[in-house]
Each structure stands twice: as C-alpha cells, then as structure tokens.
Amino acid sequence: MNYKPTDTPTSKCSVCVLGQFCLPVGLSSSDVTKIDTLVKERVHLQKGESLYRHGDPLSSVYSVRFGTLKTEYCLQDGRQQVIGFHLPGEILGLDGIGEGHYQSDAIALEESEVCIIRYEAFEDLARQIPVLQNQFHKIMSRELTQDQRHLLSLGTMRAEERLAAFLLSLSQRL
C-alpha cells in the first residue's frame, strides 16, 4: 500500500450519510453493530496520490467517503488506460479478490477520503450475516455489468456516442 491510515473514524457506518449505499437493507441492530466494527481506519488522499498500485497484495476494499478516484492500467508501452471512476458511496479494490493482488492502480483525482475495509474481516463477517454477503454479491454483479457495458460501447459506438454514454452513466451515479 502506498498510504498510511490517517485517522480512526469517529462516526460509524450506521450513521454515515453514505450508509444507504454501503449497508444492506433489513439488518438487525446487532448486525449493524457488528458491521460498525469493520471500518477501523480511513485514509485521506491528496490529488494524484495512490491508494494502491497494480501488484500490491489485496488487504482491503475501500468505500469512497468523499472525492473521486480513478482506476487505471499501465499498458506495456507505458501508456495509462483509465478503466473506472469511483464516486462517494462506491466500493473499489474488488479487482484484487480473484488473484490476491490488485489488478490496477487507484489514484485520487481530487482531495478524497476512503474507509478501509479489511477484506479478511469482511469475509468473516459476511459468513455470519448472509444479507451482507448478498449485498456484496450485488455490488460485484453491478461492477461486472458496468464492465460489460463499457466493453460493448468500445466495440460498437462512435467516439461521440461513447462520450454521451459515459456522461449519462456518470450523471446516473451522482
């Protein structure tokens, strides 16, 4: 990891304004209390600062609290290819789950803050709270669908159409 956790959250997930995006609906109060223990640290990033780099071992997934991050690949010829933008309430770092290390770089586009969700602790808790595991599956499914739409747009749309589709997607997420 290229960051050092900067603070311990004073507010809990259950009272965070972004909880509607991160927390599953229908949790019992005891489940909410357990989920509140997942986020023990946050990291504050300045514009251009990396959250993680391609090849870093998977340790956490991250929830964007404020700001915007991009994920990108470095191509063999040294060019950078942006593969995603991550807005408040969205999760990033999922690309590290399959191989055990991140497949992209995550970089702050502006001053940003993310909640650090240790993946191992999340997995343990998800086994205890099935609705949390279901929520995670939905998040991963949305990511796959978004990636498929992106691939479709690259293969079938003109540049103007791709730009319009990107702006529409971005406005729907805001």
Task: State the predicted function of each range.
Residues 1-47, 91-92, 97-99, 128:
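Cyclic nucleotide-binding regulatory module and flanking cytosolic helices
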Residues 15, 60-63, 82, 105, ...:
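Residue-level recognition of specific faces of alpha-helices
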Residues 91, 122-123:
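A generic structural signal for short hydrophobic patches within well-formed alpha-helices
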Residues 127-174:
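Polybasic "coupling" helices that flank or enter modular domains
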